[in-house]
Amino acid sequence: MACVPNKPNAPETIELTEDELRAIAGYAADCASPVLTLFERDLPSDTRPRDAVDAARVFAAGGPRTGALRQSAWAAFKAAREPSLSPAAADAARAASHAAAAAYLHPRASAHQVKHVLGAAAHAARAEELASAAGTDGTAGGAGALARARDHAPAAVRTVLGRLPVAPPGGGPVGALVRALDAALRT
């Protein structure tokens, strides 16, 4: 592994192929998609999170990594900040944002990059936890979303995680979900 030039104490780079990026983006879209309805219940006419998931799917299927894809991630992130949203809906939008942003994972051996690989899954699980606690979805909470994310992770997700340090501490409830999923996928 080579160090990133001109940056003291920069993390080493890792191998990261375009096929792996596409698989990770598709996985992230699959994780975010089931919770989109939580957002759409609160703001039915706001398509930003769904557009972000759709853009991630286009990239995963072989489409180009464009500025529009990056903008869809930012738009979903901004949608999560709408004041009228329930906490579950906000995390659903964050899951969508992470799905589109997964195409921009950096090839750095940094624990922070784990959050980019698993962020959509963790935010989707948190959205389900919050919706379940509020009695608005009929799911068993975030455990179901984490189990789905673990069981449906493609080989590329596990392979890339194996090149990265373990998920970092912190990040509140979503950070705890990232660490739990990271640990489950490394076993």
Set out the residue ranges of the language-model regions.
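Structured binding/interaction patches within domain cores
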Residues: 2-140
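Preference for long, well-ordered alpha-helical segments
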Residues: 109-187
